[in-house]
Amino acid sequence: RSPNRKTRSKKELEKEPSGISVIPGKYKIVASFGENSDTSEIEVVYDPRVDVSIEDLQKRSTFLKEVEEQTSKMNSATSRLNKIQDNIEVLLKLVDEMEVDSSLSEIKKRLKALNDSVVCLEKLVFGIEDVKGYFDQPETWQYSFRELYYGSYSNYGEPLQNQQIMLKEIKALTFNTTAKFNRFISDDWVGFEKYLIDNPIELTKRIETIENK
């Protein structure tokens, strides 16, 4: 799956993820429904109008698997960030609905700072949100990946040299971006979790009993 700015709904998660096209050959298909399953064999043949060798198709397939691996890594990273953002939104709503005291004010301040950090990390991947009109953001991971993705999928032969260079660049960008995500999670978010342990949010206020004489 491609990285997503927000947590996917249950309905979205139920959709089957797509992948690269298979190379020509014989394959076994397994269909399952509940406890029942059945198998069948199919043979995939390539478009005879396209002059490309099996060797080049295999090289292309191997290359595209490396491309998809970067998608998987970034999807895993953004999914973690989305879960943190979901938690922040829930906690902010909870704090806003309670009586404000000094401890809650500090928690709210920390939550807003964490949310700002999440937004900054999101921009590294997706860029600025809700931009009207045509606006390129070449510094983002998504822009660089799309350049590689569309160029690679439109080439049906052996990967070109410029595609190899772009893959190397997106690997480095994926590594550096996920490293920043990891630092935020291990330092900022875990630090906030420890702060909550030491300064728990009181979900209810003590209510005195009615004096009855």
Where do the model's predicted regions map?
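Extended hydrophobic-aromatic, low-complexity segments
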Residues: 3-7, 38-41, 51-54, 134
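Short acidic/polar micro-motifs centered on Gly/Asp/Asn
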Residues: 1, 34-35
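Mature extracytoplasmic or organellar-lumen-exposed domains after removal of signal/transit peptides
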Residues: 26, 33, 40-42, 76-213
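Low-complexity, Pro/Ser/Thr- and charge-rich linker/hinge segments at domain boundaries
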Residues: 41-73
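Glycine-centered tight-turn motifs at strand-turn-strand junctions
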Residues: 1-18
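A glycine-anchored, Pro-Gly-centered beta-turn/N-cap motif
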Residues: 18-26, 36
